[in-house]
Amino acid sequence: MEIVKRAIRLMHEGKCIYDQFQLDEDYNVPDAKEDVGNVIEGTVCVKTEDMKLVETYLKISGKAQFKILYMTASLDPQPAVLEGKLPFEEMVYVEQPGEEEYFLKNLRTEFSVSMVHSRKLSLHLLTELEIGRTQMISEEVTEDVESEHAVYKKMKKFRLLGLSDTKKDTYRIKEEITLPGTKESISQILLSEVSGRKLELRPGTDEVTVRGELQVFCLYLSEELKADWVSQVIPYEGKLLCNGLTEGMFYSVEHTLEDTLVDIRMDEDGEMRILGIEGTLLLRMNFYEEQEMELLEDIYSLQEQCIPEKQETIFEELLMQNQSRYKLTERLSLPELKDDVLQVLCSRGEIQIEHTEYREEGIQIEGILHLNFLYLRGDDARPYGSWQGMIPFQHLIECSDLPENVRCTMSHHVDQIQVSMAGSEAVEVRAILAFDAFLRREIELQTIVSVMEKPLDLEQMDKRPGIVGHIVQEKEDLWELAKQYMTTVEGIMNVNELENENVKIGDKLLIFKENMSIL
């Protein structure tokens, strides 16, 4: 007897690993730079360059690239910028390491700069890491059996979710901004911010359409050494090749915008009025498709004894692919700013998830939006300032009748953020927080892995009654009765003149042994 099997691929996600580390360094101002009068703000981008498992530890190394915006200590203070890198190496303990792939799922930083004196700064960096772990596995289901003898099969329909493809790829973004006519030409870039928003992926035939926007802010010095800025949203769209994909597939994506660059370019008139914008979108994509199939649940034969060996296997069923958006609106009273703020120039935010709870109505998320904004002041000696704080939030990703045995892959990011003045001592924060959830339900199947064949015990068969009267009990069906009394479903239906296989509790049936001469 030969078993016909079919393989289904699954992406198993292990428990995430959380780590936190700090870097404290003194930074000496280079000789080519002017003395520091006051620090406006510091920004940092932490990039991991290598991640590998060493026994029971994950060795993570990389660099923290920072920029410090400050005002010079000259008689005529001017904005200036300092740049540098802080290398790091972190050993993270891993519980029960296996043949899994480890990757950086989320990263959040807190960077502060304080003056020791005009030629030395003290840098403090706090970094929080969330490390994901995944392993692709393959499980088999039994669709059929092939035998020399006549066999009777009990089949059941299932709709299972299978991993179609997994892909790590990069999408390179190259765009340009032309300064409006009211802006002066650029001499030097002081500070630039490039963040992604409204990212949308759409699977097609052998390709993935990537669509999104870049929020760009640039603070610069003009040719007359006057500070100015430009802020603009740039849309982008492109395609990535991915053989085997079809339109309508389900997907789960982790994405990060890295290696952003803003440089000055010359326009057709020879003036420095164009900003080149570049960035690399790192994508970890898992594509899934639902597969409808009939699986073999049980088997018997009237010519031999069939003993199936079963194995418990966990598969997945799609619950929901959800792109949930939470609109946050908050008015912050900031008396410490008083009448200091003339205009908010640039704002940025990061999400920190504090607690996730699975409820019957969906997934309840509690977290914090860490907020930072750069603003323009009315003081010519100190024309810029920055503020940072946090806003708590709660959000429900709705999914009615959420089962207990649920698997969830979730990513989050700030899709949009805007800070505007709301009076002399207050600001209004408007943000859209994105939560992309891919929900699956665990299905426990008893899969037939082999069938043992034995000759029938003819002596026992002869002792069986030739005719049996049976009253249908709870959870019984015609197939189970046919197997129990060594007959066929068709035989029971013919004798009892049944039009279909549906029977209910209390029905009275007359059952004949299939090999009796009366039949």
Question: What kind of region is each of these model predictions?
Answer:
Residues 1-463:
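Interfacial loop/beta elements and low-complexity acidic/Ser/Thr-rich segments
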Residues 456-494, 499-519:
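Primarily a LysM-type cell-wall glycan-binding module
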